Structure formats: structure tokens, C-alpha cells
Amino acid sequence: MQIWPHKHIHTLANFSIPDYESVFELANRFDKLKNAGTKKIPALQGTLITSLFFEASTRTKNSFELAAKKLSADVQTFAPSSSSLTKGETIIDTAITYSAMGADTLVIRHSSSYITFEIAKKLDAINSNTSVLNAGDGLHSHPSQGLLDIYTLIKFFSKKSLNPKVLNSKKILIIGDVNHSRVARSNLWALSAFGADIILCGPETLIPDEFINFFKSPIPNQIEDPIKSRGSITISRSLEESIKIADAIIVLRLQKERMMENLLNSIDSYSLDYGLTSEKLSLNNKEIPILHPGPINRDIEISSKVVDEYPNCLINNQVANGIPIRMALLYLLQKYNK
């Protein structure tokens, strides 16, 4: 395993192939320990992981905290409603306070895009050793979700040992509200790094044509793309035609607040055109894997029958895989030469 080069993890846009391989190799090791019956290891004993979630979360928050505990780290949980934020303290000052308390890593979720960059910049300016791990920032990025999604697909397609190269030239269909999804953005960076060709499918109000140029989007402090050749992005407005050629499908949650923004005619019409059903899946002659980052809206973006009965619906696999992936990220940040 290479020396880990990142003090902070904000985005997958600056991940190299060796970075991905380090995460997957370590996650696979943790997976094997779990399968052998090992519930806890002392890898991060004496380390303090602080969870700063300013948005509601079930999977990510609990998964990170469980990952930290499985590594024997101490876990400190932040509750916005009972913090000094109610007295006017800024988010950055809150982060500095927890750093001063001795936090080794701050796991942060917030509604503001790029907020983790700002926090990390301030911590570095005061020579703090604390790392920042982005658990979802606005519409920008959700690195651990992107990693666990691609890890789930690699495990599915690998015949024997874990092999990320199995994604090369695979057609991965992403359905839904890409424009408002930090998960989708992280998936685009991760999937394309291994040569997957991505099809984005949905109405133009949720997937604007400019997503074709997604990889040209500037990332703070990044000079060049560490991936020399990425897979392609195409946009489709026909779910049926896209399903016919897909090797895997990632369904995104339809955020119902988009109705208030007049981006959709109705939820029913969206579900009719872009909801994933058994009937639509039958257009593909393979039993392809289905992913969804959760939480799901049953019978809107995906039918209950697909969730409950389709043999390769991997939603629960994603949840399970989130734990070793997040264990790997927490562990690697502590191996950075601070």
C-alpha cells in the first residue's frame, strides 16, 4: 500500500488510481476480518473521531461512528441544537473548538458546498493536526458514498479477487436528479477513473446538457486531473433505451422539494417516465446490479417489487460495504504524515 497523500478528504476529483486502490485494498481486508468473526481491532485506539453533522443522516452518520468504534477509536458526537451555534458561533469556530479538544479527524456533513475546504484551510492556517473528512457538503461531493458504490460494483463484477479493472468499458446508468445530487457527482469521478462509461438519464430540468462537460469543472486548489484518461458521459432522455444497454444501474432519490421549484410536472409523471420497475428492467437480457444510495422513495424512483424481489438489488450490500470503506478512510487519514 502506498503512503497516503491526503491530510483531508473533500472530493474524489483529486483521487489517483493508487488512492482508490489503497482504500479498496484496506476495505477488503477489513471485510475479511469481519467475515472471520472479528468484531473490533485496536488500529485507532487512542484516536478521537468527532462527528459534526449539520444535516439529518441515518446511514452515513451511523456508519462512520460504527466504523470508528470497530477501529477502537473514541467517538465524539455533535448535536447542533444543543451547541453554541444557537448562540451565534460560526461553523468554522465550532470546528476549531473540537480540534482544540484533540479531535484527530472531523467527519463533517453540511448543506453548504465546499464548506469542508474552508474549515480545513482555517485549521491548517493555525497549524492544527486535525484532518477533515467530507461526509456530504451541499451539492458538491459525498466521497465515502462514491467509494462504497464503486466498491459494491467491483465486488459484484469481480470473479475472484477484488479487481477494479472490471469496470473498464462497463456502461453504468445513473437515473434521476443528478443536478442536485452530491452522490452523483462523486459517482461520476469514481466510475470514470476506472474507465466506466456513464449514461445519465432523466429530464433536462434534473440533468442539464452541460453535464457532458462535468470533468472540466474546476476544483479548489487542484492544478490537474490525476486521472489521465476517464470514461465517457452521455445523456439520455429515454429510460427504456438506456436500460437495454446498461451493465449496472444507480437510482437516485427524487427530492420531492423539486416540485416546489417547478422542475417537474408531477411526481406521478416522473415516476411513469423514469421510475425503475420490473417491467422496464425486463428490457435488459441480463440480471444487472441495481444500486440506490438511500433513503429510497418506494414506488416513485424505484418500485417496491424491484427493491424487495429483484435478485441483484444491492441496496443492503451498499449499506454493509459502507462500514469497511469508512474504516479504511479513517485509518488512512491517521497514517498521513502530519
UniProtKB/Swiss-Prot annotation:
L-aspartate binds at residues 87, 182, 253. GO terms for cellular component: cytosol. Gene3D superfamilies: Aspartate/ornithine carbamoyltransferase. GO terms for molecular function: amino acid binding; aspartate carbamoyltransferase activity. Carbamoyl phosphate binds at residues 59-60, 109, 142, 145, 294-295. Pathway: Pyrimidine metabolism; UMP biosynthesis via de novo pathway; (S)-dihydroorotate from bicarbonate: step 2/3. Its EC number is 2.1.3.2. SUPFAM superfamilies: Aspartate/ornithine carbamoyltransferase. InterPro entries: Asp/Orn_carbamoyltranf_P-bd (IPR006132), Asp/Orn_carbamoylTrfase (IPR006130), Asp/Orn_carbamoylTrfase_sf (IPR036901), Asp_carbamoyltransf (IPR002082), Asp_carbamoyltransf_Asp/Orn-bd (IPR006131). It catalyses: carbamoyl phosphate + L-aspartate = N-carbamoyl-L-aspartate + phosphate + H(+). Catalyzes the condensation of carbamoyl phosphate and aspartate to form carbamoyl aspartate and inorganic phosphate, the committed step in the de novo pyrimidine nucleotide biosynthesis pathway. Belongs to the aspartate/ornithine carbamoyltransferase superfamily. ATCase family. PANTHER family: ASPARTATE CARBAMOYLTRANSFERASE, ORNITHINE CARBAMOYLTRANSFERASE, MITOCHONDRIAL. Heterododecamer (2C3:3R2) of six catalytic PyrB chains organized as two trimers (C3), and six regulatory PyrI chains organized as three dimers (R2). This is Aspartate carbamoyltransferase catalytic subunit. It comes from Prochlorococcus marinus (strain MIT 9215).
